[in-house]
């Protein structure tokens, strides 16, 4: 698995070019198209630059769902994900990331595997919050176009708890 790890640069790139980090990707983006998957609304990572509260409010009103919050998120189901993915061309690149931490959805690894098995190029942008050892085992065989890890930063732009589980998952991912 090829990984890109960045600290401060991630935030700048995220704000300027959410999923396009170099000329090659720019060209690929324009040729094949791109679909960004947000697996949930109500991300508890609560990055300073993310409009999560606005997203929760807007999604709640549009979907007529009450009480979406950091402690009560709304997850995309695997069935809904399959319905969406099956409608886009196979050459379209699929990116997991954006306005939520994809691995907070317990079905994220299953979605990534399905995307790869469907023939789509796959990208992941993640803080790893919510990622389990089982998730790593499910996805370690996938040749990601990009797997970018947003590590904890000193100013705490993202609320990432650096504990034994987080360190162990990061080490396992890097060794896979």
What spans do the regions from the language model cover?
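Classical nucleotidyltransferase
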Residues: 149-176
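Conserved alpha-helical substructure of the radical SAM core
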Residues: 6-7, 11-147, 158-159
């Amino acid at each position: 698995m090829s990984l890109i790890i960045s600290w401060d640069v991630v935030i700048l790139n995220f704000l300027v070019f959410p999923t396009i980090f170099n000329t090659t990707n720019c060209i690929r983006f324009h040729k094949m198209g791109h679909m960004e998957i947000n697996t949930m609304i109500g991300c508890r990572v609560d990055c300073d630059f993310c409009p999560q509260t606005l997203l929760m409010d807007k999604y709640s009103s549009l979907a007529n769902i009450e009480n979406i919050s950091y402690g009560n998120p709304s997850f995309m189901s695997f069935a809904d994900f399959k319905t969406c993915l099956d409608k886009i061309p196979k050459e379209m690149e699929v990116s997991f990331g954006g306005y939520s931490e994809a691995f907070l959805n317990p079905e994220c690894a299953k979605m990534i595997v399905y995307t790869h098995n469907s023939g789509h190029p796959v990208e992941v942008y993640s803080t790893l919050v919510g990622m389990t050892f089982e998730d790593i085992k499910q996805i370690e065989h996938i040749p990601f176009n990009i797997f970018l890890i947003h590590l904890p930063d000193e100013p705490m732009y993202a609320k990432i708890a650096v504990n034994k589980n987080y360190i162990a998952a990061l080490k396992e991912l890097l060794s896979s």
